């Protein structure tokens, strides 16, 4: 789901038409037309700004109508309901942050849709995609609609939601996809409860999401390796910050990434590995991409 972050004027774009995290549907700025002067009346014109395009740096006017960039003018511009003079400024597109934890509902004192999206806007992020591990987790249509209602009233930027997969029944995943969930997420560590998935369920959900044209995001760590190493850390009395690194070895991530890549290849599912930290994981990602597999 992707929505305008304005409570008084909400637009909904189904995920089939707009995948913020899918590399299959990327707008190529090189294809934007350099429009001639015309008599159109549009919503917004940002004039005299510097724009960095694939062809080089261009000074001109950005023409926006109905929420979309419709062209670039090098000299004059059409009439507009709002004109922004960007003389001396660089015009940049708003960034999309597809991995956001706003903790709302459940723990709004940590961060909620207002405080989180206010910070996003200040940093140039104009679309946030919220993760499912809130309380309740976004694993049912009821929880999805609850979070949507909260975001409608608080969000200052555009937003979308990732549904939880884990061991969630497939009928619920289908309902979430139909409601507009942009993607789904599973964890490979048991402490994430209903968001954690066995290998069998991981494969079955990948097959379903391939049919639904939704990516699966994975927190990829070998839970057994992590748990046993953490037991060693406690037994050794280590409490320093580096203990977290020493007792969470690269192989725990690398093995899980390889497992996910293998299952996703079998299911023909778009796989997205979240927050990779090991060089060996990057090597596996590059190898999978070189074979033509859709993994990011």
Residue ranges of predicted features:
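Divalent metal-coordination and catalytic microenvironments
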Residues: 49, 67, 88, 99, ...
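A glycine-rich helix N-cap at a beta->alpha junction
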Residues: 150-164
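Short, acidic/polar
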Residues: 110-117, 167-176
């Amino acid at each position: 789901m992707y929505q305008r972050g304005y409570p008084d004027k909400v637009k909904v774009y189904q995920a089939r038409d707009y995948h913020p995290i899918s590399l299959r549907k990327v707008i190529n700025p090189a294809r934007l037309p350099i429009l001639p002067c015309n008599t159109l009346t549009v919503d917004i014109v940002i004039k005299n700004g510097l724009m960095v395009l694939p062809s080089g740096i261009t000074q001109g006017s950005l023409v926006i109508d109905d929420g979309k960039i419709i062209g670039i003018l090098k000299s004059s511009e059409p009439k507009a309901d709002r004109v922004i003079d960007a003389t001396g400024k660089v015009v940049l597109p708003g960034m999309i942050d597809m991995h956001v934890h706003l903790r709302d509902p459940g723990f709004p004192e940590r961060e909620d849709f207002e405080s989180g999206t206010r910070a996003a806007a200040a940093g140039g992020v104009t679309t946030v995609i919220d993760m499912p591990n809130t309380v309740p987790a976004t694993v049912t249509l009821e929880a999805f609609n609850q979070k949507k209602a909260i975001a409608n009233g608080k969000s200052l930027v555009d937003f979308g939601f990732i549904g939880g997969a884990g061991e969630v029944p497939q009928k619920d995943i289908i309902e979430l996809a139909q409601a507009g969930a942009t993607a789904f997420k599973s964890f490979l560590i048991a402490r994430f409860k209903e968001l954690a998935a066995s290998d069998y369920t991981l494969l079955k959900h990948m097959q379903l999401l391939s049919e639904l044209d939704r990516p699966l995001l994975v927190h990829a760590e070998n839970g057994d390796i992590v748990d046993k190493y953490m037991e060693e850390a406690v037994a050794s009395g280590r409490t320093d910050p580096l203990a977290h690194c020493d007792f969470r070895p690269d192989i725990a991530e690398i093995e899980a990434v390889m497992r996910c890549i293998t299952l996703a290849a079998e299911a023909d599912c778009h796989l997205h590995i979240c927050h990779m930290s090991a060089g060996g994981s990057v090597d596996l990602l590059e190898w999978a991409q070189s074979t033509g597999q859709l993994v990011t």
